[in-house]
A protein has these predicted regions:
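Peri-transmembrane interface segments
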Residues: 1, 183, 191, 196-250
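Hydrophobic, regular-secondary-structure patches
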Residues: 1-62, 83-90, 104, 179-182, ...
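A short, local hydrophobic-aromatic micro-motif
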Residues: 40-43, 118, 188
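Hydrophobic secondary-structure segments that place a key small or acidic residue at a functional site
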Residues: 45-48, 57-67, 76-172
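A short beta-strand structural signal in non-transmembrane regions
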Residues: 150-207
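Interfacial "coupling" helices/loops that link adjacent transmembrane helices in transporter permeases
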Residues: 252-256
Length: 256
């Protein structure tokens, strides 16, 4: 939460996203949020946990799609690097946490595309401990929302067979429908930073009212992470320690 640089998280209505639940909002929502009172910056972001391949091995990682911008000016960017540089191109570059064991210059395969590691960061992991890999937002949208070639072909066949879209008297309708099916117009959340003098609760309520979306402050998001995600892991660890203590006591009793 701290490394994201956000004061507010705008997510799909009635969800606990983007960390505890899946969330999907249109990628043009951030423009109207930027014009709301008290908002200093707003940036789209995506999160996707998956296996990232490098050569013959793979690493489970949280893929973070970050919006174009500058460090310190765009929420969601890794706040600092230990080696290399930040992402400067719109495609096929990545910044990885050192816990992933990736090195500068490594070639990673994410879905159908390959990425070059240009920077390394530290202490950027998910709530489950998976290292983060940052890539450009457009690439991340494609990785999460775009179907594979076979699925796209099957979808187009179904669309062509649907008489509602394939009308003889409307020649451009089919092309428009096909184009809309191939776009990636969704993100998981919008990260918002506030102007000085504006309270998070006040701005969050304004966004909820006018945009009909769910908005979480930093305190609320911390509560979700601790209560919904970390608490479950803590209970599992506690149960394991209790079993270990019982087994150890039994072994000591048998020895005595």
């Amino acid at each position: 939460l701290d490394n994201s640089g956000a004061d507010l998280w705008v997510v799909q209505k009635d969800t606990l996203g983007p960390y505890a639940e899946s969330s999907s909002v249109n990628d043009d929502v951030y423009r109207t949020i930027l014009n709301m009172p008290g908002v200093a910056r707003a940036a789209n972001v995506t999160y996707l946990t998956m296996q990232v391949r490098k050569g013959g091995s793979d690493v489970r990682a949280l893929i973070v799609g970050i919006a174009p911008g500058e460090l310190g000016d765009t929420p969601g960017w890794p706040p600092y690097l230990v080696a290399g540089r930040q992402i400067t191109r719109s495609h096929y570059e990545a910044v990885a946490d050192i816990a992933s064991k990736f090195k500068l210059g490594d070639r990673l395969t994410i879905r159908r595309n390959q990425y070059t590691v240009v920077g390394l960061t530290r202490r950027m992991v998910s709530s489950s401990g998976d290292p983060m890999v940052f890539i450009p937002l457009k690439d991340a949208q494609e990785a999460q929302f775009l179907k594979d070639n076979d699925a796209i072909w099957q979808s187009r066949r179904r669309t062509e067979a649907n008489q509602a879209f394939n009308r003889p008297g409307v020649p451009g309708l089919m092309d428009a429908v096909m184009a809309s099916q191939s776009t990636n117009a969704f993100v998981n959340a919008v990260l918002v930073t506030l102007k000085p003098g504006h309270g998070p609760d006040e701005v969050a309520e304004s966004i909820r009212r006018w945009k009909r979306l769910t908005v979480y402050t930093r305190a609320q998001m911390e509560g979700i992470l601790i209560g919904k995600l970390i608490a479950t892991s803590a209970k599992q660890i506690g149960m394991f320690l209790a079993i270990l203590a019982i087994v150890s006591a039994a072994i000591v009793a048998f020895i005595i």
